[in-house]
């Protein structure tokens, strides 16, 4: 959209430091480490963070229209719902029209969409305006019956089917994607070995090498 990135677009960043805690970066500045117990526990430090997120949204709202809010993970995690500040709670605070994006490439899209919507609270469900089917391989017209079935099951229309694209490079959201990265040395290429550490941040800096045919970046546990 031609707008320079700003910390208001990602006011709360968590960078894992070990299996039980993360560094908290607030409005672009580190403010300390927080354990999962502190983050999700009785003290619920997320309340203060949520206030900061609201203020960041208000600053963006004053400058731009429309604003796209991207959720994180499932919107129907029952055990986390009362403490989740990234999905429906933020949507309610912003009065945002909400669209559920479902990855059909993983399989089980009908159960996933139906179950997710069925578990929403009434005040959350009223915000739902449509379902978007992502990563569809083949002829999208073959999913017409699927669109009708999902509308019948959920009462919410499928507003779009996005095909699988092989020629676009979008940064991965988190390190879970590293499991699918290339891990093979190739002859005739400039090989770049990237050591798979337990916790990696900024690994998307290597994406540019993947787009250059001269290079073969590969991820490995071998430090020899």
Residue ranges and their predicted role:
Residues 1-224:
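Flexible phosphate-sensing "switch/lid" loops adjacent to ATP/NTP-binding sites
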